[in-house]
Swiss-Prot record:
<dbReference type="GO" id="GO:0003735">
    <property type="term" value="F:structural constituent of ribosome"/>
</dbReference>
<dbReference type="GO" id="GO:0070181">
    <property type="term" value="F:small ribosomal subunit rRNA binding"/>
</dbReference>
<dbReference type="GO" id="GO:0042274">
    <property type="term" value="P:ribosomal small subunit biogenesis"/>
</dbReference>
<dbReference type="GO" id="GO:0006412">
    <property type="term" value="P:translation"/>
</dbReference>
<dbReference type="GO" id="GO:0022627">
    <property type="term" value="C:cytosolic small ribosomal subunit"/>
</dbReference>
<dbReference type="InterPro" id="IPR009068">
    <property type="entry name" value="uS15_NS1_RNA-bd_sf"/>
</dbReference>
<dbReference type="GO" id="GO:0032040">
    <property type="term" value="C:small-subunit processome"/>
</dbReference>
<dbReference type="InterPro" id="IPR012606">
    <property type="entry name" value="Ribosomal_uS15_N"/>
</dbReference>
<comment type="subunit">
    <text>Component of the small ribosomal subunit. Part of the small subunit (SSU) processome, composed of more than 70 proteins and the RNA chaperone small nucleolar RNA (snoRNA) U3.</text>
</comment>
<dbReference type="Pfam" id="PF00312">
    <property type="entry name" value="Ribosomal_S15"/>
</dbReference>
<keyword id="KW-0687">Ribonucleoprotein</keyword>
<dbReference type="GO" id="GO:0005730">
    <property type="term" value="C:nucleolus"/>
</dbReference>
<dbReference type="Pfam" id="PF08069">
    <property type="entry name" value="Ribosomal_S13_N"/>
</dbReference>
<comment type="function">
    <text>Component of the small ribosomal subunit. The ribosome is a large ribonucleoprotein complex responsible for the synthesis of proteins in the cell. Part of the small subunit (SSU) processome, first precursor of the small eukaryotic ribosomal subunit. During the assembly of the SSU processome in the nucleolus, many ribosome biogenesis factors, an RNA chaperone and ribosomal proteins associate with the nascent pre-rRNA and work in concert to generate RNA folding, modifications, rearrangements and cleavage as well as targeted degradation of pre-ribosomal RNA by the RNA exosome.</text>
</comment>
<keyword id="KW-0539">Nucleus</keyword>
<keyword id="KW-0689">Ribosomal protein</keyword>
<protein>
    <recommendedName>
        <fullName>Small ribosomal subunit protein uS15</fullName>
    </recommendedName>
</protein>
Amino acid sequence: MGRMHNPGKGMAKSAIPYRRSVPSWQKMTAEEVQDQIVKMAKKGLRPSQIGVILRDSHGVGQVRRLAGNKIFRILKSKGMAPELPEDLYHLVKKAVAIRKHLERSRKDIDSKYRLILVESRIHRLARYYKTKRQLPPTWKYESGTAASLVS
Protein backbone atom coordinates (compact mmCIF):
# COMPACT_ATOMS: atom_id res chain seq x y z
CA MET A 1 0.00 0.00 0.00
CA GLY A 2 1.35 3.41 -0.89
CA ARG A 3 1.80 6.30 1.47
CA MET A 4 -0.61 9.22 1.51
CA HIS A 5 1.73 12.22 1.54
CA ASN A 6 4.93 10.48 0.46
CA PRO A 7 6.25 8.83 -2.71
CA GLY A 8 7.24 5.65 -0.81
CA LYS A 9 5.64 2.33 -1.63
CA GLY A 10 5.81 0.70 1.81
CA MET A 11 6.74 -2.83 0.74
CA ALA A 12 7.95 -4.18 4.10
CA LYS A 13 5.65 -6.65 5.83
CA SER A 14 5.76 -9.60 8.17
CA ALA A 15 4.59 -13.08 7.25
CA ILE A 16 1.85 -14.62 9.38
CA PRO A 17 2.30 -18.36 9.96
CA TYR A 18 0.09 -20.56 7.80
CA ARG A 19 -0.92 -22.90 10.62
CA ARG A 20 -3.85 -21.45 12.51
CA SER A 21 -3.52 -23.66 15.57
CA VAL A 22 -1.87 -22.72 18.85
CA PRO A 23 1.83 -23.79 18.95
CA SER A 24 2.59 -26.85 21.07
CA TRP A 25 5.20 -24.94 23.13
CA GLN A 26 2.66 -22.29 24.19
CA LYS A 27 2.19 -22.43 27.95
CA MET A 28 -0.38 -19.67 28.52
CA THR A 29 -4.08 -20.42 28.38
CA ALA A 30 -6.78 -18.19 26.91
CA GLU A 31 -7.93 -17.09 30.37
CA GLU A 32 -4.41 -16.14 31.42
CA VAL A 33 -3.95 -14.10 28.25
CA GLN A 34 -7.23 -12.27 28.82
CA ASP A 35 -6.26 -11.56 32.43
CA GLN A 36 -2.90 -10.16 31.28
CA ILE A 37 -4.62 -7.98 28.67
CA VAL A 38 -7.04 -6.55 31.24
CA LYS A 39 -4.23 -5.99 33.75
CA MET A 40 -2.12 -4.10 31.20
CA ALA A 41 -5.11 -2.06 30.01
CA LYS A 42 -5.74 -0.96 33.60
CA LYS A 43 -2.16 0.36 33.66
CA GLY A 44 -3.06 2.57 30.70
CA LEU A 45 -1.37 0.69 27.85
CA ARG A 46 -2.78 0.86 24.32
CA PRO A 47 -3.72 -2.38 22.45
CA SER A 48 -0.59 -2.37 20.27
CA GLN A 49 1.64 -1.93 23.32
CA ILE A 50 -0.15 -4.84 24.99
CA GLY A 51 0.48 -6.99 21.92
CA VAL A 52 4.19 -6.15 21.87
CA ILE A 53 4.58 -7.00 25.56
CA LEU A 54 2.69 -10.28 25.16
CA ARG A 55 4.85 -11.18 22.15
CA ASP A 56 8.21 -10.24 23.67
CA SER A 57 7.77 -11.18 27.33
CA HIS A 58 5.20 -13.99 27.30
CA GLY A 59 5.79 -15.65 23.92
CA VAL A 60 2.28 -15.09 22.59
CA GLY A 61 2.70 -14.60 18.84
CA GLN A 62 -0.92 -13.91 18.03
CA VAL A 63 -3.54 -13.33 20.69
CA ARG A 64 -6.35 -14.12 18.27
CA ARG A 65 -5.15 -17.71 17.81
CA LEU A 66 -4.89 -18.32 21.53
CA ALA A 67 -7.82 -16.36 22.97
CA GLY A 68 -10.16 -16.47 19.97
CA ASN A 69 -10.47 -12.68 19.75
CA LYS A 70 -8.25 -9.73 19.01
CA ILE A 71 -6.93 -7.56 21.83
CA PHE A 72 -9.26 -4.68 20.99
CA ARG A 73 -12.33 -6.94 20.98
CA ILE A 74 -11.35 -8.44 24.32
CA LEU A 75 -11.01 -4.93 25.78
CA LYS A 76 -14.32 -3.91 24.20
CA SER A 77 -16.14 -6.87 25.76
CA LYS A 78 -14.71 -5.93 29.16
CA GLY A 79 -15.70 -2.27 28.64
CA MET A 80 -12.10 -1.06 28.63
CA ALA A 81 -11.66 -0.12 24.97
CA PRO A 82 -10.12 3.32 24.32
CA GLU A 83 -12.61 5.96 23.17
CA LEU A 84 -10.40 7.00 20.25
CA PRO A 85 -9.10 4.40 17.78
CA GLU A 86 -5.37 3.99 18.18
CA ASP A 87 -4.22 5.29 14.80
CA LEU A 88 -6.39 8.39 15.18
CA TYR A 89 -5.08 8.86 18.72
CA HIS A 90 -1.47 8.88 17.51
CA LEU A 91 -2.23 11.33 14.70
CA VAL A 92 -3.90 13.72 17.17
CA LYS A 93 -0.92 13.33 19.50
CA LYS A 94 1.45 14.19 16.63
CA ALA A 95 -0.64 17.24 15.68
CA VAL A 96 -0.58 18.48 19.28
CA ALA A 97 3.22 18.09 19.39
CA ILE A 98 3.66 19.99 16.11
CA ARG A 99 1.34 22.76 17.29
CA LYS A 100 3.28 23.03 20.56
CA HIS A 101 6.51 23.31 18.54
CA LEU A 102 4.96 26.03 16.37
CA GLU A 103 4.13 28.09 19.46
CA ARG A 104 7.86 28.29 20.23
CA SER A 105 9.07 28.79 16.65
CA ARG A 106 6.49 30.53 14.52
CA LYS A 107 8.69 30.86 11.43
CA ASP A 108 9.12 27.12 10.93
CA ILE A 109 7.34 26.90 7.59
CA ASP A 110 8.00 23.19 7.07
CA SER A 111 6.31 22.33 10.36
CA LYS A 112 3.29 24.41 9.38
CA TYR A 113 3.06 22.39 6.18
CA ARG A 114 3.46 19.07 8.04
CA LEU A 115 0.74 20.13 10.47
CA ILE A 116 -1.63 20.70 7.54
CA LEU A 117 -0.82 17.20 6.23
CA VAL A 118 -1.33 15.55 9.63
CA GLU A 119 -4.62 17.36 10.21
CA SER A 120 -5.88 16.35 6.77
CA ARG A 121 -5.09 12.73 7.69
CA ILE A 122 -7.01 13.19 10.93
CA HIS A 123 -10.07 14.51 9.08
CA ARG A 124 -9.92 11.68 6.55
CA LEU A 125 -9.56 9.00 9.22
CA ALA A 126 -12.33 10.55 11.33
CA ARG A 127 -14.66 10.44 8.33
CA TYR A 128 -13.84 6.74 7.88
CA TYR A 129 -14.48 5.92 11.56
CA LYS A 130 -17.77 7.81 11.50
CA THR A 131 -18.98 5.64 8.61
CA LYS A 132 -17.84 2.51 10.51
CA ARG A 133 -19.58 3.87 13.65
CA GLN A 134 -16.49 3.66 15.81
CA LEU A 135 -16.75 7.42 16.37
CA PRO A 136 -19.97 9.27 17.14
CA PRO A 137 -21.31 11.27 14.17
CA THR A 138 -20.92 14.51 16.13
CA TRP A 139 -17.19 13.97 16.83
CA LYS A 140 -15.04 16.71 15.37
CA TYR A 141 -11.33 17.42 15.55
CA GLU A 142 -10.61 20.87 16.93
CA SER A 143 -7.04 21.99 17.42
CA GLY A 144 -7.88 23.92 20.58
CA THR A 145 -9.32 20.93 22.42
CA ALA A 146 -7.05 18.27 20.90
CA ALA A 147 -4.60 18.37 23.80
CA SER A 148 -7.31 17.19 26.18
CA LEU A 149 -7.98 14.15 23.94
CA VAL A 150 -4.44 12.81 24.23
CA SER A 151 -3.58 13.75 27.81
